[in-house]
Amino acid sequence: MVHFTAEEKAAITSLWSKMNVEEAGGEALGRLLVVYPWTQRFFDNFGNLSSPSAILGNPKVKAHGKKVLTSFGDAIKNMDNLKTTFAKLSELHCDKLHVDPENFRLLGNVMVIILATHFGKEFTPEVQAAWQKLVSAVAIALGHKYH
C-alpha cells in the first residue's frame, strides 16, 4: 500500500479542485491514443481515429476521457485505499477488455503532462512528485487483477 503524506495529499487535491474534468479527460485520452497509437485497438467502436485531429475532436474520446478522469477523482477521494477503489475496474479491464496493464502507466504519464500544461508554474517539482506517486499507485491498483 502506498502512503501519501499530508503535503502530498494537499498538493494533489489543490490542483484537482481546479481541474476541468471534461476538458482534461478528453485531452488525456486523446493524447494517449495519438502518442501510443497501439492503444487505439481498445477503442475500435469509437469511429474515426485516423488522425490526431480526428482523435482529439472525437466526441466518444472526449466522453470516455471524462469517465476516466472521473475515476481519477475517485482515486483522490480514496488515496489510502486504491486497491479496493479500483477492484471492479481492474477486473473489467483484465477479464473482459484484456487491456495490457502497461497502458495504465502510459495513461498516468499522459495525465502528468496534461497537468503540467494546464497548471504551468503551479506544477512544481514537488507537486509533480506527488502526482507521479498517485498515477503510479493507480496504475498498480488497476493492474492488480492481472497478478
Curated annotation (Swiss-Prot):
Modified sites of kind Phosphoserine: S14, S51
Globin domain segment(s): 3-147
Family annotation (Gene3D superfamilies): Globins
GO molecular function: haptoglobin binding; heme binding; hemoglobin alpha binding; metal ion binding; organic acid binding; oxygen binding; oxygen carrier activity; peroxidase activity
Pfam families xrefs: Globin
Annotated InterPro entries: Globin (IPR000971), Globin-like_sf (IPR009050), Globin/Proto (IPR012292), Hemoglobin_b (IPR002337), Hemoglobin_oxygen_transport (IPR050056)
Tissue: Red blood cells.
Keywords: Heme, Iron, Metal-binding, Oxygen transport, Phosphoprotein, Transport
Residues binding heme b, per UniProt: H64, H93
GO biological process: hydrogen peroxide catabolic process
GO CC annotation: blood microparticle; haptoglobin-hemoglobin complex; hemoglobin complex
Keyword S-adenosyl-L-methionine: no
UniProt family annotation: Belongs to the globin family.
Record function comment: The epsilon chain is a beta-type chain of early mammalian embryonic hemoglobin.
Description of how the protein assembles with itself and partners: Heterotetramer of two alpha chains and two epsilon chains in early embryonic hemoglobin Gower-2; two zeta chains and two epsilon chains in early embryonic hemoglobin Gower-1.
UniProt protein name: Hemoglobin subunit epsilon
